Every structure is written in C-alpha cells, then in structure tokens.
C-alpha cells in the first residue's frame, strides 16, 4: 500500500543527469514554492513508460501553469535516463532511484518485476503518482501493479487545479 493522502512526504535526494551535467535534486527544496508531481515508472526504453513520459513532456507547460514541478523517477541509472530522454525527446526531469530506496520508502516497489522472466528484478518502481503540496503533504496518491496501466492524468490535473 503506497503512502496515503494527508501524510508528510518522505524527503529524498536523487541524482539527475542532463546536458548541463549531473546534479542532485532534493524533494524538500520545492516545499514552500510549488506543488510537486512525482511520477514513478518501471524503466526507460519501455513502450508504456515512453508513452507516459513523452505525453507528460508534451504537456509540461500545463503542469507548470498548475504550479507544479514534475519529476519522473525510475530505477535506471542517470546515464541510461539521459540517453532515453534524448532519444525520445523527453523533457520531464528524470531522477535516478538506482538503489530503489525511494520506491521502497514510498511503498511502490515491486517485490519481483516480470517474475515470469526470472530476472530477479526486485525493487523496480511500480507505475505510481504522488502529488505533494507546498507544505510537503501528500494530496494525491495512485499506484498500479499493472505496469502497462497509465495513471489517470485527468484526476491528477484536477487535483493540481484545486491546489493551485
């Protein structure tokens, strides 16, 4: 069960890699400024994840107008994320939860991802969404065990509009 609405969002610091170089992103740096939209997804170079992140990238200005900072989070290393973002023209900042600590803290990590393939991929993030308000409180939480199911972005936008 993922973290619930009304609880304080656990703080974290994760790396990102862009053309400007690597940097660390700390969740609480947004507190007091903007709402934060966290989009957990299983992995780069996957059809459903590409569809999700490309769609959000195309709509990034709409999220900005709703006073939200958006981050995509996967267990990929920052270099793989950067290569994927460049290939697919993804503009959402991607954070690397390479050790799966944040996915586990937010309780959205698979015990075993794609168990039928016997790859031993535990800890991979589920597809999940958290909206965290300016005070660091979770205002929306959605998680899905089916990695092919996209979040309900209409509900996400409606909630962000309420918080604006």
Regions found by a protein language model. Give the residues of each.
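Chalcogenol-based redox active-site neighborhoods
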Residues: 1-164
């Amino acid at each position: 069960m993922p973290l619930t609405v009304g609880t304080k969002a656990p703080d974290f610091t994760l790396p990102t890699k862009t053309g400007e170089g690597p940097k660390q992103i700390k969740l609480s740096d947004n507190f007091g400024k903007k709402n934060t939209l966290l989009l957990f997804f299983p992995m780069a170079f996957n059809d459903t994840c590409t569809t999700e992140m490309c769609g959000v990238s195309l709509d990034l200005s709409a999220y900005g107008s709703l006073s939200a900072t958006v981050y995509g989070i996967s267990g990929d290393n920052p270099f793989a994320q950067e290569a994927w973002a460049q290939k697919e023209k993804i503009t959402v900042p991607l954070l690397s939860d390479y050790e799966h600590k944040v996915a586990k803290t937010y309780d959205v990590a698979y015990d075993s991802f794609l168990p039928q393939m016997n790859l031993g991929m535990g800890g991979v993030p589920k597809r999940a969404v958290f909206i965290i308000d300016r005070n660091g409180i979770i205002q929306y939480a959605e998680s899905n065990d089916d990695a092919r199911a996209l979040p309900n972005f209409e509900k996400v936008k409606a909630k962000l509009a309420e918080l604006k």
